[in-house]
C-alpha cells in the first residue's frame, strides 16, 4: 500500500521546474492514483455515481515549479474544476483532503446560498476540520475559528471567491507511522463531507 512519507514532502525542496515535476511524477502521482482509486471505490456506492480520478499535470507552468500538487475525484470524466469535487493534495508541510469549490463552479451562487441556509451541516463536522479560501496559498483556518457567514457570502458574491473544506494531516503527524490509519482518516474525512457535497450537487 502506497502512502506519503518524508520523501514526498521533500519533493517541494527540489529546485527547478523539470526536476521537481520529475519527482512529483515518480513519487507523488502513483500515491494519488492508488489512494484515489480506493476512495472512489468506497465513495461511489454512497453517492450512487461513479467517480473518476484526475491528477494535476501542471502543464501551464513554464518557469516556476509547483509549490503543491493535487488530485481530484469527480463524476465528470473530462474535468473537475467546474463542479464540486473532492481533492487529495500535498504542500511541503501537510497533506489535504478537501471538498473543493474553485474556478467558478456551475451554480456557485446557489451552492453558497444553500450552505448559508444549512449551517448545521458544518456544525456536524469534527473540530479538526479546516477551511481554505484560496487554493493557491497554504494558509488555512480551523473551522471553529472561521467566520462561516463571511466566508460563504464571499464565495457567493465575489467572482474569484473560493471555498474548500476538509481536514489535513501535517507532515509531523504520527498518523504517517501507520499507513492504514492515515488512509482511514482520509476516507473518513470525505465521508463526513458527503452531506455538503450532496447538497451542493443538488443545486
Curated annotation (Swiss-Prot):
The record's InterPro entries line, in alphabetical order, gives: UPF0637, UPF0637_domain_sf
Q: Name one Pfam family in it.
A: DUF1054
Q: Which domain of life is it from?
A: Bacteria
Question: SUPFAM superfamilies of this UniProt entry?
Answer: YktB/PF0168-like
Family, similarity comment = Belongs to the UPF0637 family.
Name this protein carries in UniProt: UPF0637 protein EF_3078
Q: Which organism is it from?
A: Enterococcus faecalis (strain ATCC 700802 / V583)
